[in-house]
């Protein structure tokens, strides 16, 4: 039984979140939560919340046993970028892209 949780428009770039996602792909959820707890990155907190949501979804909606769950799939897609202006010297301006990402975690008992 596969259960999905998503965080859309997460305020971190997909490139940064993928570094954390690669750490937990294929692991048991208990081990993945432990890794995320001690990973010193902002993205680790975002991924941890999505993983906890997926675990809760599996338990509540599908009646799955938490001890059997593992991270079947985790992928991070780029979301929309917010365009901002940063003033520069001599009346010029640069465009700043505040990137977002869509984090998807799939847990499975197989």
From Swiss-Prot:
Q: Which GO terms describe its biological process?
A: translation
From the UniProt record, list the coiled-coil ranges. Answer: none
Q: Which GO terms describe its cellular component?
A: cytosolic large ribosomal subunit
Q: Does the keyword Transferase apply?
A: no
* Record keywords: Ribonucleoprotein, Ribosomal protein, RNA-binding, rRNA-binding
Gene Ontology MF terms: rRNA binding; structural constituent of ribosome
Is Ribonucleoprotein found in the keyword set? Answer: yes
Q: Which Pfam families match?
A: Ribosomal_L22 (PF00237)
Q: Per its database record, what is this protein's job?
A: This protein binds specifically to 23S rRNA; its binding is stimulated by other ribosomal proteins, e.g. L4, L17, and L20. It is important during the early stages of 50S assembly. It makes multiple contacts with different domains of the 23S rRNA in the assembled 50S subunit and ribosome. The globular domain of the protein is located near the polypeptide exit tunnel on the outside of the subunit, while an extended beta-hairpin is found that lines the wall of the exit tunnel in the center of the 70S ribosome.
How this chain assembles, per its entry, is:
Part of the 50S ribosomal subunit.
Q: Which family does it belong to?
A: Belongs to the universal ribosomal protein uL22 family.
- Protein name from the UniProt record: Large ribosomal subunit protein uL22
What does the record give as the organism's lineage? Bacteria, Pseudomonadati, Pseudomonadota, Gammaproteobacteria, Enterobacterales
Tell me what gene encodes this.
Answer: rplV
